[in-house]
Amino acid sequence: MNLHEFQAKHLFADYDIPIPQGYVARSSGEAVEAAGRLGGSVWVVKAQVHAGGRGKAGGVKVLKTKEEVEEFTDSLLGSRLVTHQTDAKGQPIHAVLVEQGLDIARELYLGALVDRASKRVTFMGSAAGGMDIEEVAASTPEKILTLAVDPAAGFQAYQGRKMAFALGLEGKQIGQLVKIMKSLYRIFEEKDLSMIEINPLIVTGDGQLLALDAKVNVDDNAVEIGRQPQIADMRDITQEDEAEVQAAEHNLNYITLDGNIGCMVNGAGLAMATMDVVNLHGGSPANFLDVGGGTTTERVTAAFKLILSSDTVEGILVNIFGGIVRCDVIAEGIIAAVKEVGVDVPVVVRLEGTNVEQGKQMLADSGMDLIPADDLTDAAKKVVAAVGKAA
């Protein structure tokens, strides 16, 4: 679960991490009022969306008059911001963050994530912070220092000093960074984060460190089981894929893709293998959908509705291995879904496992135009051919 920048900064403030003074605004009038409360003659207005690359995409601007603040805010609110991290539709903008303009001497990068190789929270830092950090990571990875934290010992001050030296900090700035990193580690542990990032972490003209931007990702599992009620209240579903939100309500694992063949599979591994085989035979999956092991007729019906909610789907491949879930239950769900939804695209069904013959017979007796398949390769070939024929 992602947080907006203003939400992440509120979290930072709770842990005494220095941030610029700013206010969130949901109208141009509120933005102008925020600029007045901040004072000064330079303000920064930032679109609040769950995506990086806002600056290069025109979602962040330095402004010098309140008229400019009003005009820029009006141009953002109600529109969609397309960045290199979004799809072609972009993300909707419902709020902006108005902050005071600052004297920036240096831009640094500081972040932390769960390193699955070392099984530890690992800090990353670079003296080359700012909008081009991704290019730095790709072309000159040696400019990024990584420090893994031993979970038994926790974050140690010497690690902060090592990072400070690598970033070229000096004097009181070293102590400031140690304090910031210690607070970041506390947030990471106490709020069940999977990633936290400050880009840029700036050095101001008077030598102070300040988190100019903030990106926070929280472990979905911690939110779902109720460990983080405060974080759960910050969720903004307008920034999430609508189909994926609906899938979560039915405990379905669903990810929207760019293809035209809908896939309904039980098991994440089998789902990925199914997509690979569809690609191998010239098709393009429209989604990843794992209906899970405890599948019911209702969940299968919900899965069909999700797949068909996409305008790009021209065919559906159902690939079920009946281990925990029985093939007759899947067949019952398919029949119910087709009757309720009114499927008008080719549907290829491959069943194998528990009660497979009973399931196949139910599909055959349904009188519906369902295409049976003997194995995964056969199923992939048939759905690709059916989609091509329909086109």
Swiss-Prot record:
GO MF annotation terms: ATP binding; magnesium ion binding; succinate-CoA ligase (ADP-forming) activity; succinate-CoA ligase (GDP-forming) activity
HAMAP family assigned: Succ_CoA_beta
Keywords: ATP-binding, Ligase, Magnesium, Metal-binding, Nucleotide-binding, Tricarboxylic acid cycle
GO BP: any one term: succinyl-CoA metabolic process
Name under which the protein is recorded: Succinate--CoA ligase [ADP-forming] subunit beta
Pfam families xref list: ATP-grasp_2, Ligase_CoA
Role this protein plays: Succinyl-CoA synthetase functions in the citric acid cycle (TCA), coupling the hydrolysis of succinyl-CoA to the synthesis of either ATP or GTP and thus represents the only step of substrate-level phosphorylation in the TCA. The beta subunit provides nucleotide specificity of the enzyme and binds the substrate succinate, while the binding sites for coenzyme A and phosphate are found in the alpha subunit.
Cofactor(s) required for function per UniProt: Mg(2+)
InterPro entries tied to this protein: ATP-grasp (IPR011761), ATP-grasp_succ-CoA_synth-type (IPR013650), ATP_grasp_subdomain_1 (IPR013815), Succ-CoA_synthase_bsu_CS (IPR017866), SUCC_ACL_C (IPR005811), Succ_CoA_ligase-like_bsu (IPR005809), Succinyl-CoA_synth-like (IPR016102)
Domain ATP-grasp: 9-246
Subunit structure of this chain's protein: Heterotetramer of two alpha and two beta subunits.
Reactions performed catalytically: succinate + ATP + CoA = succinyl-CoA + ADP + phosphate; GTP + succinate + CoA = succinyl-CoA + GDP + phosphate
Protein EC: 6.2.1.5
Membership in a protein family: Belongs to the succinate/malate CoA ligase beta subunit family.
An example Gene Ontology CC term for this record: cytosol
